[in-house]
């Protein structure tokens, strides 16, 4: 595995990307990155992708729940309704978001009408069994459902905490799965690929992983180069977040950093790059209907990039991305 803090040349970066695509994307191509867009009782559905070994099929675009809990309730309801109307059937959230507020909005606007048609994912920040069980029961209650499709260990950051959290919570997750309260289990994090790799060394029980994947990632502390191959080897569902580097590609939240978008590439190109990798879904925080519709348009017009085009896009931003500045808002944030 590479140490992304080491300075690497453009040629070395492209060689590493070529090794990734050559060694790990063959199985992905074999079972197909996309299925034809289906329809259900609610209307046309976005193209589906398999979620690793879970047997679930997820829409290539998923709603990120943190943004559902932020705006006024009427706007959150509008985003949920627009997501359904535009073919999204995969919804992610977490017990942490707005202290359960995001889950409550799913329970108010999503599950009463659409539960049988959607997949709902949530997460727990628990470090011990009792807290994990309380979080699970609270999530089920707030979302007004008797099962969760994917329950995830949320935001695993520090290496030593990873041991504590996995050993403290995994048995509860497995028991909840046996009880039918959750269908599948996974873990998430965005601070350190090394911690992700450590979690994967601790256990093979997790079925999915949600992590940062974006055009800047291969150049700095890369999840794509260091974790994605392991997920593919284990047939785990790889899910992408921070696909615009938490706005880091657009100068950051304050707009003072380097602007990759729109100076060097478009939002559509950035999303297309991610979808061209072997990810099951792209989880996006979409706080407005307009934002959601723009992302849906990119999904519906998606044509996979060639290996050469992916490498060219990474190389196009590598000189800025190698410093890590664009991703500093989440990578390396390993505090408890």
Put a short name on every predicted segment.
Residues 2-21:
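N-terminal secretory signal peptides and thylakoid transit peptides that target proteins
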Residues 28-61, 68-69:
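C-terminal segment of N-terminal export signals and the immediately downstream linker at the start
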Residues 51, 63, 91, 106, ...:
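Conserved, mostly hydrophobic/aromatic
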Residues 52-55, 107-115, 139-145, 200-204:
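Acidic (Asp/Glu)-rich catalytic clusters
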Residues 64-74, 122-130, 255-262:
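Active-site mouth loops of central-metabolism enzymes
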Residues 92-109:
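Glycine-rich, proline-tolerant flexible connector loops at the mouths of alpha/beta enzymes
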Residues 127-239, 290:
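Glycine/proline-rich, positively charged
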Residues 202, 224-336:
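Structured C-terminal cap/extension of enzyme domains
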């Amino acid at each position: 595995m590479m140490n992304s803090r080491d300075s690497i040349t453009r040629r070395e970066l492209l060689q590493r990307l070529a090794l990734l695509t050559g060694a790990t994307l063959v199985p992905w191509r074999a079972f197909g990155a996309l299925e034809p867009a289906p329809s259900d009782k609610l209307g046309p559905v976005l193209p589906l992708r398999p979620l690793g070994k879970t047997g679930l099929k997820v829409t290539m675009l998923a709603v990120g729940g943190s943004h559902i809990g932020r705006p006024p309730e009427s706007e959150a309801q509008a985003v949920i309704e627009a997501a359904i109307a535009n073919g999204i059937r995969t919804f992610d959230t977490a017990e942490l978001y707005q202290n359960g507020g995001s889950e409550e909005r799913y329970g108010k606007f999503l599950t009463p009408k659409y539960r049988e048609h959607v997949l709902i994912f949530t997460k727990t920040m628990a470090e011990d069994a009792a807290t994990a069980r309380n979080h699970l029961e609270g999530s089920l209650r707030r979302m007004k459902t008797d099962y969760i499709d994917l329950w995830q260990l949320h935001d695993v950051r520090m290496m030593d905490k990873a041991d504590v959290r996995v050993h403290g919570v995994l048995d509860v997750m497995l028991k909840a799965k046996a009880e039918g309260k959750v269908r599948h289990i996974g873990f998430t994090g965005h601070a350190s690929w090394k911690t992700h790799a450590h979690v994967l060394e601790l256990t093979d029980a997790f079925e999915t992983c949600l992590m940062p994947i974006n055009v800047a990632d291969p150049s700095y502390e890369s999840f794509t180069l260091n974790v994605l191959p392991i997920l593919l080897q284990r047939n785990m569902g790889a899910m992408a977040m921070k696909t615009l580097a938490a706005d880091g590609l657009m100068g950051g939240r304050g707009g003072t950093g380097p602007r990759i978008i729109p100076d060097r590439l478009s939002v559509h190109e950035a999303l297309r790059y991610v979808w061209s990798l072997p990810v099951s879904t792209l989880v996006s925080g979409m706080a407005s209907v307009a934002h959601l519709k723009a992302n849906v348009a990119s999904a519906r017009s998606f044509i996979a990039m060639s290996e050469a085009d992916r490498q060219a896009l990474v190389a196009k931003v590598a000189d800025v991305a190698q410093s890590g500045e664009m991703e500093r808002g989440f990578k390396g944030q390993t505090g408890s």
